Amino acid sequence: MTKANALFDLSGKTALITGSSQGIGFALAKGLAEAGAAVVINGRDKAKLADAAEKLETGGATVHRLPFDACDHGAVKAAIDDFEASVGPIDILFNNAGMQHRAPLEDFPADAFDRILNTNVKTVFNVGQAVARHMIKRGAGKIVNIASVQTSLARPGIAPYTATKGAVGNLTKGMATDWAKYGLQVNAIAPGYFETPLNAALVADPEFSAWLEKRTPAGRWGKVEELVGAAVFLSSAGSSFVNGHTLYVDGGITASL
């Protein structure tokens, strides 16, 4: 193995990815496993989680399943503490759990606002805190929060989602500010528009797809596999002095008007 390859090798590391039974989370789990990490996949649907685990194991990955509700602070702490005690340390955390709800802001349901806030922001706090407490004791750890282009930009009909992703970007900075002194690196990845279950309605909309392809300098939707390079970098020794940064993987959409 060359020095360059060793810098990004995740062999011997264990990575927890929340919301990883499908979409971006599954792609991240697959990519981290291919870089050498054992992966801990998470979700509330045990059947989907089992299916995801089978697919990853077929590809040769070492997989653990941890089906907790990331919105439940007590359940998160119990699950993380039990895993650390019975299986081993979590070296890398990807806070990926998220949801979307589209509606005009003046008609946006209050209960949907609460759900999106809990799912997109509270989960980052819940899981980040539970895992960081163990990382701090060891003096090392990598946390990567999944933000969005909506961390910086807004679109009609998704104002609460935009607010939550802005919060993720700033919570990332806050985590880095508090935890860097303990040897942790906390960063975020902000995906652009990718072909995922969360974006299924948009992918199926010819008018939106045409607008997106014109708006994005790269001229196309992103493929989830294109997030893996950023994920491996921020999980590896190659990012040892990168902290509090949000890395946009968006085909250039936030760089242009």
Q: Which ranges hold each PLM region?
A:
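Residue(s) in the substrate-gating loop at a strand-loop-helix junction
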Residues: S148
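Substrate-binding pocket helix/loop in short-chain dehydrogenase/reductase
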Residues: P104-L105, A112-L117, I143, F208, ...
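Short, small/polar-rich loop/turn modules that mediate ligand/substrate recognition or access, typified
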Residues: A180, Q185, V242-G244
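Conserved glycine-rich cofactor-binding loop
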Residues: T14, S21-G23
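Conserved mid-core segment of classical short-chain dehydrogenase/reductases
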Residues: K77, Q100-D114, K137, G157-P160, ...
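Short C-terminal tail/terminal secondary-structure segment
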Residues: T2-A6, L153, V232, N243-L257
